[in-house]
Amino acid sequence: MKSPKIRFKGFDGDWEQRKFGETVIIERGGSPRPIDAFITDDENGLNWVKIGDAPEQGNYITKTAEKIRPEGLKKTREVHPGDLILSNSMSFGRPYIMAIDGCIHDGWLLIRDEEKRYDLKFLCQMLGTEQMLAQYRAMAAGSTVNNLNKELVGNTEVKVPSIAEQAKIGEYFSKVDDLITLHQKKCEQLTILKKYMLQKMFPQNGSDKPEIRFEGFTDDWEQRKLSDVVDVRSGRDYKHLEEGDIPVYGTGGYMLSVSEALSDDEDAIGIGRKGTIDNPYILRAPFWTVDTLFYAVPREKHDLNFVYGIFQNINWKAKDESTGVPSLSKATINAVSTMTPDYEEQRLIGEYFSNLDHLITLHQQKCDELRNAKKFMLQNMFI
């Protein structure tokens, strides 16, 4: 293939094939040793780039957690804004653009485009495509060390268009990355808000009132045992059932679908009996749960979403009854003390957190959709 399947309007003609190492400078990083002797808090120290400094989302290294003394410079590799660095671990193998000056250890490769043959954003995206990763894997096949190195990366073949088309492609993917980052940050902010509000809208430290309430509610909350709030029921084995459309849940979430329901019309909260015991989640009827997952059905005058908030506020790990695999019993769950208001206040609190969860889910779904779209476009806008 000499041109990609998807192109911007106005661009045609074949892409040019190049041996990558003949078009850029590729060098391995280095580490002064022992490295601990060179780490410094001095503001005049040199930025020391580690894997942990790379963002989970985005392509730019903008800061480092550590610095090294300038004396270590002769034993390392200096990098500058506009340089690309690539982790030499093939399981990682993701490129980043330096936005700051710094130094890299021998777990990084420096890629410097001195002759400006590439648009920087295009080059960063190209180095992370599945097409490039496939070349890395093929060249490393049979090697005893499954890592990237200067020779391997330099021997790859790349196919590139004009600088103008590169710039268009690079800018397009940069905007997609910005959108993903935006939705991811919104997700994180809402998750932090939810954690904060779970503390503020439920009584803490023996108090009989929460710090934050809806207008019009002033009465004290009443102390209850969870046994007064929910009916904790046991999951059961599903292997005797036929395939169907009733979801089966375990401690990790959805597993498969079967022909019968354990709960036909009562929504509940799933809480692990064994294994993952600190990840409660809402179960919508009809459903089936396996024997390692209890399902707690709210009793009359108790709102499901409010009760879910109670479950999220409990430190379930502290109630682990096993020295091996984490475990809970019905008796332990039933004995937990909690506080509840009247039903109308429960309903409003539950609705508030349900809306928050919905917003978090929407932003996460948007992130997933954008990542899938980006993956498709990377496969079709590069060769």
Residue spans for each PLM region:
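Catalytic core of tubulin tyrosine ligase-like
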Residues: 316
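Amphipathic alpha-helical segments with low aromatic content
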Residues: 1-16, 156, 162-222, 345-383
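Non-catalytic beta-sheet/beta-sandwich ligand-binding modules that flank or precede catalytic cores
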Residues: 15, 19-20, 24, 43, ...
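Structural detector for helix-capping/boundary residues
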Residues: 6-9, 18-23, 52, 130, ...
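Short coil/turn segments at secondary-structure boundaries
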Residues: 33-39, 139, 239-246, 323-325
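A short beta-sheet element
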Residues: 50-52, 59-130, 250-312, 321-325, ...
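A short glycine-rich beta-alpha junction/loop motif
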Residues: 88, 103-109, 141-164, 288-292, ...
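Non-catalytic DNA-recognition/assembly elements of restriction-modification systems
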Residues: 9-31, 213-249
